Regions:
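Basic, amphipathic juxtamembrane/active-site segments
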Residues: 74-114
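Glycine-rich active-site/cofactor-binding loop and its immediate structural neighborhood
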Residues: 55-87
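Active-site His/Glu-centered metal-binding helix of metallohydrolases
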Residues: 67-75, 88, 92-96, 125-128, ...
Length: 201
Protein backbone atom coordinates (compact mmCIF):
# COMPACT_ATOMS: atom_id res chain seq x y z
CA UNK A 1 0.00 0.00 0.00
CA UNK A 2 1.46 3.36 -1.07
CA UNK A 3 0.10 6.89 -1.40
CA UNK A 4 0.22 6.40 -5.17
CA UNK A 5 -2.92 4.28 -4.82
CA UNK A 6 -5.00 7.29 -3.73
CA UNK A 7 -3.80 9.32 -6.72
CA UNK A 8 -7.15 9.05 -8.61
CA UNK A 9 -8.98 10.77 -5.73
CA UNK A 10 -6.35 13.51 -5.59
CA UNK A 11 -6.64 14.00 -9.35
CA UNK A 12 -10.41 14.34 -9.21
CA UNK A 13 -10.03 17.17 -6.70
CA UNK A 14 -7.53 18.92 -8.98
CA UNK A 15 -9.49 18.49 -12.23
CA UNK A 16 -11.37 21.84 -12.00
CA UNK A 17 -8.02 23.60 -11.54
CA UNK A 18 -6.65 21.76 -14.57
CA UNK A 19 -9.49 22.99 -16.79
CA UNK A 20 -9.08 26.53 -15.42
CA UNK A 21 -5.37 26.51 -16.32
CA UNK A 22 -6.03 24.96 -19.73
CA UNK A 23 -8.51 27.71 -20.62
CA UNK A 24 -5.77 30.24 -19.87
CA UNK A 25 -3.36 28.58 -22.28
CA UNK A 26 -1.12 27.10 -19.57
CA UNK A 27 0.60 23.99 -20.93
CA UNK A 28 1.57 20.76 -19.18
CA UNK A 29 5.27 21.47 -19.79
CA UNK A 30 4.95 24.90 -18.20
CA UNK A 31 3.48 23.30 -15.08
CA UNK A 32 6.33 20.75 -15.03
CA UNK A 33 8.92 23.53 -15.26
CA UNK A 34 7.12 25.54 -12.57
CA UNK A 35 7.33 22.56 -10.19
CA UNK A 36 11.05 22.19 -10.93
CA UNK A 37 11.71 25.90 -10.43
CA UNK A 38 9.82 25.89 -7.13
CA UNK A 39 11.86 22.90 -5.92
CA UNK A 40 15.20 24.43 -6.91
CA UNK A 41 14.43 27.81 -5.33
CA UNK A 42 13.29 26.15 -2.10
CA UNK A 43 16.37 23.94 -2.04
CA UNK A 44 18.65 26.93 -2.54
CA UNK A 45 16.98 28.78 0.31
CA UNK A 46 17.22 25.79 2.67
CA UNK A 47 20.87 25.22 1.73
CA UNK A 48 21.82 28.86 2.27
CA UNK A 49 19.85 29.15 5.51
CA UNK A 50 20.00 25.65 7.09
CA UNK A 51 18.07 26.77 10.15
CA UNK A 52 15.60 24.15 11.44
CA UNK A 53 12.73 26.63 11.42
CA UNK A 54 13.16 27.13 7.68
CA UNK A 55 12.26 23.49 7.09
CA UNK A 56 8.67 24.46 7.79
CA UNK A 57 8.70 25.32 4.08
CA UNK A 58 9.34 21.73 3.12
CA UNK A 59 5.88 20.19 3.70
CA UNK A 60 4.23 23.18 2.01
CA UNK A 61 6.46 23.04 -1.06
CA UNK A 62 6.27 19.24 -1.29
CA UNK A 63 2.46 19.39 -1.27
CA UNK A 64 2.41 22.10 -3.95
CA UNK A 65 4.91 20.12 -6.01
CA UNK A 66 2.79 16.97 -5.68
CA UNK A 67 -0.25 18.91 -6.91
CA UNK A 68 1.69 20.38 -9.84
CA UNK A 69 3.02 16.93 -10.76
CA UNK A 70 -0.51 15.56 -10.81
CA UNK A 71 -1.75 18.52 -12.84
CA UNK A 72 0.89 18.26 -15.55
CA UNK A 73 0.19 14.56 -16.08
CA UNK A 74 -3.56 15.06 -16.18
CA UNK A 75 -3.28 17.96 -18.62
CA UNK A 76 -0.93 16.02 -20.87
CA UNK A 77 -3.32 13.06 -21.05
CA UNK A 78 -6.71 14.77 -21.02
CA UNK A 79 -5.85 17.84 -23.10
CA UNK A 80 -3.85 16.03 -25.79
CA UNK A 81 -0.49 17.51 -24.78
CA UNK A 82 1.58 14.33 -24.47
CA UNK A 83 5.00 14.85 -26.08
CA UNK A 84 8.42 13.27 -25.91
CA UNK A 85 9.79 16.51 -24.49
CA UNK A 86 7.12 16.40 -21.80
CA UNK A 87 8.10 12.85 -20.83
CA UNK A 88 11.76 13.88 -20.58
CA UNK A 89 10.94 16.97 -18.51
CA UNK A 90 8.67 14.95 -16.23
CA UNK A 91 11.17 12.20 -15.43
CA UNK A 92 14.28 14.37 -15.15
CA UNK A 93 12.37 17.06 -13.27
CA UNK A 94 11.16 14.56 -10.67
CA UNK A 95 14.66 13.24 -9.97
CA UNK A 96 16.27 16.69 -9.90
CA UNK A 97 13.53 18.01 -7.60
CA UNK A 98 13.89 15.07 -5.22
CA UNK A 99 17.64 15.52 -4.97
CA UNK A 100 17.36 19.29 -4.61
CA UNK A 101 14.70 19.24 -1.89
CA UNK A 102 16.30 16.51 0.22
CA UNK A 103 19.95 17.56 -0.18
CA UNK A 104 19.59 20.44 2.36
CA UNK A 105 19.10 17.80 5.09
CA UNK A 106 22.84 17.28 4.70
CA UNK A 107 23.54 20.74 6.14
CA UNK A 108 21.56 20.20 9.33
CA UNK A 109 23.33 19.57 12.63
CA UNK A 110 23.39 15.89 13.62
CA UNK A 111 23.17 14.81 9.96
CA UNK A 112 25.76 12.38 8.64
CA UNK A 113 26.64 13.52 5.12
CA UNK A 114 27.38 9.98 3.94
CA UNK A 115 23.94 8.76 5.03
CA UNK A 116 22.17 11.63 3.26
CA UNK A 117 24.16 10.98 0.07
CA UNK A 118 23.37 7.25 0.32
CA UNK A 119 19.68 8.08 0.70
CA UNK A 120 19.79 10.33 -2.38
CA UNK A 121 21.57 7.63 -4.37
CA UNK A 122 18.89 5.13 -3.37
CA UNK A 123 16.23 7.64 -4.43
CA UNK A 124 17.75 7.83 -7.91
CA UNK A 125 18.08 4.03 -8.04
CA UNK A 126 14.42 3.62 -7.14
CA UNK A 127 13.27 5.89 -9.96
CA UNK A 128 15.67 4.20 -12.38
CA UNK A 129 14.17 0.80 -11.54
CA UNK A 130 10.68 2.19 -12.12
CA UNK A 131 11.72 3.43 -15.57
CA UNK A 132 13.47 0.14 -16.27
CA UNK A 133 10.11 -1.59 -15.97
CA UNK A 134 8.69 0.75 -18.60
CA UNK A 135 11.63 0.12 -20.93
CA UNK A 136 11.24 -3.66 -20.70
CA UNK A 137 7.48 -4.15 -20.30
CA UNK A 138 6.05 -0.84 -21.48
CA UNK A 139 4.51 -0.08 -18.07
CA UNK A 140 6.25 2.03 -15.45
CA UNK A 141 6.49 0.42 -12.03
CA UNK A 142 5.24 2.38 -9.03
CA UNK A 143 5.71 -0.46 -6.54
CA UNK A 144 6.33 0.59 -2.93
CA UNK A 145 6.81 0.81 -0.09
CA UNK A 146 8.66 4.13 -0.52
CA UNK A 147 7.64 5.82 -3.74
CA UNK A 148 7.75 9.51 -4.58
CA UNK A 149 4.52 10.42 -2.75
CA UNK A 150 5.50 8.39 0.31
CA UNK A 151 8.87 10.18 0.44
CA UNK A 152 7.16 13.54 0.17
CA UNK A 153 4.86 12.67 3.08
CA UNK A 154 7.61 11.36 5.39
CA UNK A 155 10.21 14.02 4.65
CA UNK A 156 7.58 16.76 4.70
CA UNK A 157 6.43 15.63 8.14
CA UNK A 158 10.05 15.44 9.29
CA UNK A 159 10.67 18.98 8.06
CA UNK A 160 7.64 20.10 10.05
CA UNK A 161 8.79 18.14 13.11
CA UNK A 162 12.32 19.57 13.25
CA UNK A 163 10.99 23.08 12.58
CA UNK A 164 8.80 22.81 15.69
CA UNK A 165 11.06 20.59 17.78
CA UNK A 166 14.70 21.22 16.72
CA UNK A 167 15.91 18.76 19.37
CA UNK A 168 14.45 15.96 17.25
CA UNK A 169 17.35 16.44 14.84
CA UNK A 170 19.26 13.99 17.02
CA UNK A 171 17.21 11.31 15.21
CA UNK A 172 18.16 12.55 11.72
CA UNK A 173 20.59 9.76 10.94
CA UNK A 174 18.15 7.08 12.08
CA UNK A 175 15.60 8.42 9.61
CA UNK A 176 18.13 8.60 6.76
CA UNK A 177 19.15 5.00 7.46
CA UNK A 178 15.57 3.71 7.57
CA UNK A 179 14.72 5.69 4.43
CA UNK A 180 17.69 4.16 2.59
CA UNK A 181 16.58 0.65 3.53
CA UNK A 182 13.01 1.37 2.39
CA UNK A 183 14.29 2.84 -0.87
CA UNK A 184 16.39 -0.25 -1.57
CA UNK A 185 13.37 -2.41 -0.77
CA UNK A 186 11.33 -0.32 -3.22
CA UNK A 187 13.99 -0.69 -5.93
CA UNK A 188 14.00 -4.46 -5.44
CA UNK A 189 10.19 -4.60 -5.60
CA UNK A 190 10.19 -2.61 -8.83
CA UNK A 191 12.74 -4.96 -10.38
CA UNK A 192 10.67 -7.94 -9.21
CA UNK A 193 7.61 -6.43 -10.87
CA UNK A 194 9.55 -6.39 -14.15
CA UNK A 195 10.38 -10.08 -13.83
CA UNK A 196 6.86 -11.06 -12.79
CA UNK A 197 5.26 -9.21 -15.70
CA UNK A 198 7.77 -10.73 -18.11
CA UNK A 199 7.05 -14.21 -16.76
CA UNK A 200 3.29 -13.72 -17.15
CA UNK A 201 3.80 -12.91 -20.80
Amino acid sequence: MTLYQIKPLFQSLLRPTMFWLHKRQVSANQITLAALALSLLTALLLALVPYPGMFLLLPIVLFIRMALNALDGMMARECNQQTRLGAILNETGDVISDIALYLPFLFLPESNASLVILMLFCTILTEFCGLLAQTINGIRSYAGPFGKSDRALIFGLWGLAIAIYPQWMQWNNLLWGIASILLLWTAINRCRSVLLMSAER
